[in-house]
Amino acid sequence: DFSSDVTNIRKSEARAVMLLMDEEPGALAIRQIRDAGLDTQLVGTLAMGSDRFLKRLDAKYLDGMVQYSAFPPSAPLQRIQEFGQAYRAHFGEEAHGFAAQSYDGLLLAVNAMQAAGTATDGAAIQKALSGLSFDGVIGHVQFDGNNQASPPVYITQWCKGGTRKIDFPADLKSGCGAG
């Protein structure tokens, strides 16, 4: 129950609320915020940008909400379309960011183990990983000197009727129905 949070949002007159939540609590929070009559701009996580999330809420609750994404499933990029088609054929639902990140993460781990020549020496694998540059489903991933990955980030927005659009990056910006 997020009723005390909803009360605090109302009292603060917040213009935006960042919902750092997974699907189930996020859906409940959004429903309670909207049912309370608050039209605060909602900003969600990649868990809140897929058809799987839309099944948890009536589309009216999501209209205008933005979220960061690792994988906008309708982006006109061959790598995203191919993964999405294969995922749908195997699992019977739209691909989502967690699936794409998990797929790429596993491939990155395998590549690092191959480069290190071991699957059991964590230090060697970490060293190999820091030197990898990888083009995966989510895009180009490279690790910096602090072993932090720098994958691409997309910003998508829910539109009326449960469609999405891509707001960022600019070269993929699209109208409703293409996110």
Regions found by a protein language model. Give the residues of each.
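Extracytosolic ligand-binding ectodomains
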Residues: 1-179
